[in-house]
Amino acid sequence: MVRVKKTLNNACEFANIAIELVDDNRKRHWAVEKIMLENDTSTIATEVPVYMQLSTSTIPWIKDMKSKNDYITGHIDLLQYRNKKLYILDYKPGAAKEKPLGQLFVYACCLSKSTGIHFVRMKLAWFDNENYYEVDAMDVYKTVMESFKISNRKVSKKMQIYINKTL
C-alpha cells in the first residue's frame, strides 16, 4: 500500500520566496527551481531529463506500455540527495489537489534504469508553498506490481493515460 506522508519541508519556504519575488505565474516554476538550486544544499539538479526505451525495461508492466516510438521521456523538476536517498521533487501549485504519483513513479523508473539506483533509495515528492507530500518509491513499485499481477498482467488505465499524455 502506498502511504503518502504530508510533512513540513523547506521546499515550501523556498516556494513562498519565489512567489514573493516573481509576479508572473508562468515564471514561478523556474523561480522555485532556481532559488532551491542556489540556496538549498540538498538540491543537486533541476530540469533533469529522463527517458527510457520501453522495450528494454526489466519491469514487466513498462514493457507492455504502448507509445508512439517505444520511448518515454520527461523532466524532473528538482533532484535532491539527503539522508542517503535520492528525492524526485515536482513543484505543483495546488499540490493538495494534485495526484502526480504516476508521473513521478515513471520518472523514478527512468532514473533507476539509467543510473542503476534502486527504488529503495528513492523518494517521490510534490509540493507548493503550503504543502509537501512524499512517498517511498519502493512502496509505489510494490503496489503497482501487485496491481499488475491481479489485473492479469495489464497496465492500469490511469498509468496508460499518463503515458499517452507524456509521449
Which stretches of residues belong to each language-model region?
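A non-catalytic, helix-rich entry segment at domain boundaries
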Residues: 1-48
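Surface-exposed cleft-lining segments at the edges of enzyme active sites
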Residues: 12-19, 65, 90-95
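A short linear-motif detector with a strong N-terminal bias
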Residues: 22-27, 67-68, 102-105
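Active-site metal-binding core of divalent-cation-utilizing nuclease and nuclease-like domains
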Residues: 35-83
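Nucleic-acid nuclease catalytic cores
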Residues: 73-76, 80-143
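Catalytic core segments in nucleotide and nucleic-acid processing enzymes
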Residues: 104, 144-147, 152-156, 160-161
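Accessory terminal regions of nucleic-acid processing enzymes
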Residues: 163-167
